[in-house]
Amino acid sequence: MAHKTFISYKYSEAQDLRDRIIKALGDDASYYQGETSDSPDLTDTSTENIKKNLKDMMYDTSVTIVIISPHIKESKWIDWEIEYCLKNITRKNRTSHTNGVVGVIMKVNGGYDWFKYTSTKLDGCSVTNYYDSKVYDIINNNRYNQHPKVYSCNQCKCVNALTGSYIAFVEEDEFLSNPQKYINNAYDKSEKDAEGYNLTKQR
């Protein structure tokens, strides 16, 4: 089943990946509610007008795709967009559902080591780590927040990459090869108002 999606991204460095994600959605791109290369330029518009346009795009969506790019934190909008998508917003007696969220890590210079690295636990388990300082607190606070936690390994206490965090991180190549898999995973976690996760909805 297709879900209405919104892509949150830093325009100056991620618009190409945004376009490739929309293309990878195939027929499901008709459910995409966010900006495209044909969207009007709002650069010189007031902050309130930009917010109104973004709210109109986001309100009816159920999954937010956040592009994790090197200068994401320089954006004035992304953390606000994530906060809006996580909240239950009421319009005309209808309350929106908390969105599922997936973070797509941009490939830079042919790889992802600008943001992720692997380490080995004492028991021999290999785990993926991330440079948390490169993303917003609202993203970090919704990582490893499954409740109760379900461990992939009870000895080293590592968790599943997709279900252990409300906001899972997925490499660009993996996401583009099967976007529906990761969109569905994000949506499934949002069911019953994200029951099973301790959500942080404030920036």
Region locations from a protein language model:
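Conserved TIR/SEFIR loop-to-helix hotspot centered on a Trp-containing motif
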Residues: H71-N88
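Conserved RecA-like P-loop NTPase helicase motor core
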Residues: N88-R94
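A short acidic (Asp/Glu
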Residues: D16-D19, K76-W80, Y112-K116
